[in-house]
Design a protein with these regions (language model features):
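Short acidic/glycine-rich loops and adjacent helix/strand connectors
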Residues: 1-309
Length: 309
């Protein structure tokens, strides 16, 4: 029998660092912890990618990023904005602090972006990262009634290279809409968060009336209040900037986006036209181009292309 209380204390006492997770993986051998590929796994992945691209071995490089690609895309498409506060929110991005917190992925990011004669520049200021998905993967090895018992109630905060990071086990607002889409039956996999956002407009605040429209409406109200506080935080980081760009899949919430204009009348708010993950393709290309302009070897460019450029 699994020593449930001991297991819970090991996992939920503090946010999981790489060192702690490696120790737990050794202690609890009966569990399969998928959190860090070994060198063999990385080699296999590199070989698959290079084969698909028709490149020889060693001719492919990559870097782990997601939210900053949303930021590049949004800033590039924002008309008449030479500088802006960029807020990215979605169901979950990359594991930005891979070396220290390998189970936590981006859920909220604040950047300051500006354009000048040398191109576009994105400066990270704040990120919140959640390990909820990892926790759920481990929780699935327990009975259903214990599915959430590993979540850590306390957030950790660290500052690295001038960027403030907050580590949590709670879901992002994007995750909440995804969970609601599954719970309300809009789809089987929780991929229809946008349907829940649209469904909210048909609901009302009616105490003791919990149909799917009213439930979606309540989530929409909670999400609005939460996001207002995040926008205030972003403004505190950049008090002199009056432009705001919203990106990430969560920025598809049209109803709340309109209300932010009313809440912040002294700011211009621009919503990235392609805030979903398709926009990250453009963002990655824009980031790579800027790195080449700046004389930095791009992480997404094979060595032979960089040497030829």
């Amino acid at each position: 029998r699994i020593r449930t209380r001991e297991f819970k204390e090991d996992f939920s006492h503090r946010q999981l660092t790489r060192e702690k997770l490696e120790n737990l993986a050794e202690k609890w051998e009966e569990f399969n912890f998928v959190f860090c590929p070994n060198s063999g796994d990385e080699t296999i992945m590199d070989d698959i990618i290079t084969e698909q691209l028709g490149l020889p071995r060693g001719e492919y490089q990559y870097n782990v990023d997601h939210h900053i690609h949303h930021a590049y895309c949004g800033l590039n498409l924002a008309p008449h904005m030479d500088n802006a506060i960029i807020i990215v929110m979605d169901g979950g991005g990359c594991r930005k602090l891979w070396d220290m917190y390998p189970t936590h992925q981006e859920i909220e990011s604040i950047y300051y972006g500006y354009k000048d004669e040398d191109g576009m520049h994105i400066e990270p200021q704040y990120q919140k990262l959640s390990n909820l998905r990892f926790i759920h993967d481990i929780s699935e090895q327990f009975p259903n009634e214990l599915s959430s018992f590993l979540e850590c109630p306390l957030n950790d905060k660290v500052t690295l290279d001038g960027v403030d990071y907050e580590l949590t086990s709670w879901p992002s607002m994007g995750m909440n809409f995804s969970n609601a889409s599954h719970a309300l039956g809009t789809d089987k996999l929780g991929r229809a968060a946008g349907k829940v956002m649209g469904m909210a407009s048909y609901g009302h605040h009616q105490p003791q009336v919990f149909n799917r429209f009213n439930i979606a409406h309540e989530l929409e109200l909670v999400a609005y209040d939460y996001t207002v506080e995040l926008i205030k935080k972003a403004i505190d980081y950049n008090p002199d900037c009056k432009n705001i760009i919203l990106s990430g899949g969560y920025a598809l919430n049209c109803t709340n986006n309109y209300k932010y204009l009313q809440k912040f009348p002294n700011h211009q708010i621009f919503v990235d036209p392609i805030p979903h993950d398709g926009g990250t393709a453009a963002g990655a290309a824009l980031q790579m181009y800027q790195q080449m302009v700046d004389g930095i070897e791009p992480a997404y460019c094979k060595p032979s292309v960089w040497s030829e450029s």
